[in-house]
């Protein structure tokens, strides 16, 4: 074939790709024609109704009765079509659609994922300026979750929380938040220059578990700021908590909105809420302005994939977009993005029944395990902030067996292959999801029965372990510098003994659950040090500290 003919034979297939960057609807439809899904002139599609019933000029790709039963979600379809092109790829990433993939990695995951590990090609849209399949995927997610707008996140819920706080709080503003918030909320205050107004959640002494925050606590915090001549820029609520405890968001949102204060909900553990009558209501249905959900935790997206949802007019959407563009990678992984689209579609296809089996298995497991001698099941802790609990989060107490949660977890993992999600001093927590099988439940029950039968082999928990209030380290939080000031201040290293009373210069956080105990700018207390040393001795991993042995700390030079 002559060079002229060669040029002509390929021109029709590939010139349209490289001449239309950024995304252009008319030219990007070709790769999706095979599936009957085109963004522009679309087969089996009609114009859609926009948010709040306003007619939209966009064309919806939502499947209708005439559409193929095998129709793929928009971003999944676009990624599949692009990967199937017979392309001569002179673009990133360097493995070149798997042709140069490391053999050790292909032995682990095969070669197919590399075909779909593509950059922001024109037909795949742009995460930060979406016009095509990403835009459509996010719109479909917004409709499913009840948002006016949804953003896909490839930096986990961490970047979603950071963006939400940066979009609502400016330097010097005050954010009301629980003292046991995730590390992402603390890093957000460093990034934004926001000042914290902490609420200390109620604490269940028997379980060594913190609850959510109450409407009365939020109201009190707002009033205290008003007496100081200040107004909260936003309120952050963690609901559900890692243990599945849900706050009364309906009342909290009503209180905040009466003061024109937006409510951000860290709903990382609750992307599934509202999709079954036995599940608690979602935060958006209760009035939250912003909700950040880890779609990978209970739903079926890939790890690190999350969503940020918005509704109402108290938050500037453009500021959210600008914040996300600063915080997220400029080279987002399209497998992560496509997994969000696929997880949304999976729920949409069978939203009324998809959680039936999972909930039944969780309730069955709780019923069987609650009858085992010496075992406690977290259902109704003794505090008022316990408004609701997620039935798919199951916390088992083992202190009556003379075991710590860390010891019980070690036995279950080594002897029964049961892997827990969260381990505490007195309990361990299990996360049920759509992939939970009956065999998993049977192994769990057998393992817990074994713990009970062999309890005579264990020494009773020491009184200082049984009776200590581990949440007491948050009782006397004193801030000498803002988190941002302390983060950038000059530091010096001192021994743990000499650190008492000094200003903490680092963020010290046991993980899981990722709740910081010492934050830059706070005075180091004996209670905080005692808790960190004890939980580390029980097997927790301490993150953030320059000295992971905790023999020394970084403190601020004043």
Q: Where are the predicted features?
A:
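Conserved PLP-enzyme active-site core in the AAT-like
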Residues: 72-78, 88, 108, 126-129, ...
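PLP-dependent enzyme catalytic core of the Aspartate aminotransferase-like
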Residues: 411-415, 420-558
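Short glycine-rich or small-residue beta-strand-to-loop segments that form or flank ligand, phosphate
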Residues: 124, 151-153, 235-238, 395, ...
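N-terminal chloroplast transit peptides
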Residues: 1-48
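Conserved small-domain helix->loop->beta segment predominantly found in fold-type I
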Residues: 352-434, 455-480
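Short acidic (Asp/Glu) and glycine-rich catalytic loops that position anionic groups and cofactors
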Residues: 317-321, 339-348, 387-392, 422-428, ...
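N-terminal entrance/gating region of PLP-dependent enzymes' catalytic architecture
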Residues: 48-136, 140-143, 509-511, 526, ...
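A generic structural motif
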Residues: 241, 346, 400-401, 434-438
């Amino acid at each position: 074939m002559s060079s002229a003919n060669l040029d002509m034979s390929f021109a029709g297939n590939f010139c349209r790709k490289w001449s239309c960057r950024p995304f252009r609807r008319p030219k990007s439809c070709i790769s999706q024609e095979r599936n009957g899904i085109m963004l522009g002139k679309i087969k089996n599609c009609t114009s859609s109704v926009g948010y709040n019933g306003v007619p939209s000029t966009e064309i919806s790709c939502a499947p209708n009765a005439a559409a193929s039963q095998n129709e793929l979600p928009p971003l999944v379809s676009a990624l599949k079509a692009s990967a199937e092109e017979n392309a001569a790829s002179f673009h990133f990433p360097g493995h070149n659609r798997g042709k140069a993939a490391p053999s050790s990695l292909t032995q682990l995951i095969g070669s197919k994922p590399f075909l779909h590990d593509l950059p922001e090609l024109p037909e795949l849209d742009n995460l930060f300026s979406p016009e095509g399949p990403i835009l459509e995927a996010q719109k479909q997610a917004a409709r499913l979750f009840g948002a006016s707008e949804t953003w896909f996140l490839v930096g986990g819920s961490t970047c979603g929380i950071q963006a939400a706080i940066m979009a609502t709080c400016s330097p010097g503003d005050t954010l009301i938040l629980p003292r046991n918030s995730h590390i992402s909320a603390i890093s957000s205050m460093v990034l934004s220059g926001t000042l914290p107004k902490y609420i200390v959640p109620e604490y269940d002494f028997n379980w060594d578990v913190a609850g959510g925050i109450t409407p009365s606590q939020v109201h009190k915090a707002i009033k205290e700021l008003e007496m100081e001549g200040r107004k909260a820029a936003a309120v952050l609520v963690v609901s559900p908590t890692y243990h599945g405890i849900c706050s009364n968001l309906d009342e909290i949102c009503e209180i905040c909105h009466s003061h024109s204060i937006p409510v951000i909900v860290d709903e990382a553990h609750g992307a599934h809420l509202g999709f079954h009558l036995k599940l608690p209501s979602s935060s958006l249905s209760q009035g939250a302005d912003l909700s950040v959900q880890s779609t990978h935790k209970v739903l079926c997206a890939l790890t690190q994939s999350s969503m940020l949802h918005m509704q109402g007019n108290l938050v500037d959407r453009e500021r959210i977009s600008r914040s996300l563009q600063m915080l997220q990678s400029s080279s987002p992984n399209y497998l992560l993005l496509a997994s969000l689209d696929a997880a949304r579609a999976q729920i949409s296809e069978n939203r009324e029944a998809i959680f039936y089996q999972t909930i039944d298995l969780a309730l069955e497991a709780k019923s069987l395990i609650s009858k085992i001698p010496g075992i406690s099941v977290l259902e109704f802790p003794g505090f008022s902030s316990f408004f609701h609990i997620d039935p798919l989060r199951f916390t088992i107490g083992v202190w009556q067996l003379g075991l710590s949660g860390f010891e019980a977890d070690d036995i279950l993992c080594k002897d029964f292959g049961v892997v827990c999600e969260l381990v505490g001093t007195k309990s361990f927590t299990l996360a049920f999801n759509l992939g939970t099988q009956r065999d998993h439940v049977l192994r769990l029950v057998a393992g817990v029965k074994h713990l009970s039968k062999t309890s005579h082999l264990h020494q009773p928990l020491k009184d200082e372990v049984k009776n200590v209030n581990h949440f007491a380290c948050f009782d006397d939080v004193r801030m000498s510098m803002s988190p941002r000031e302390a983060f950038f201040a000059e530091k010096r290293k001192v021994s743990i003994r000499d650190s008492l009373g000094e200003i903490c210069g680092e963020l010290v956080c046991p993980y899981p659950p990722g709740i910081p105990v010492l934050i830059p700018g706070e005075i180091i207390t004996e209670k905080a040090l005692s808790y960190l040393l004890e939980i580390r001795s029980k097997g927790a991993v301490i993150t953030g500290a320059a000295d992971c042995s905790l023999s020394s700390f970084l403190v601020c030079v004043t």
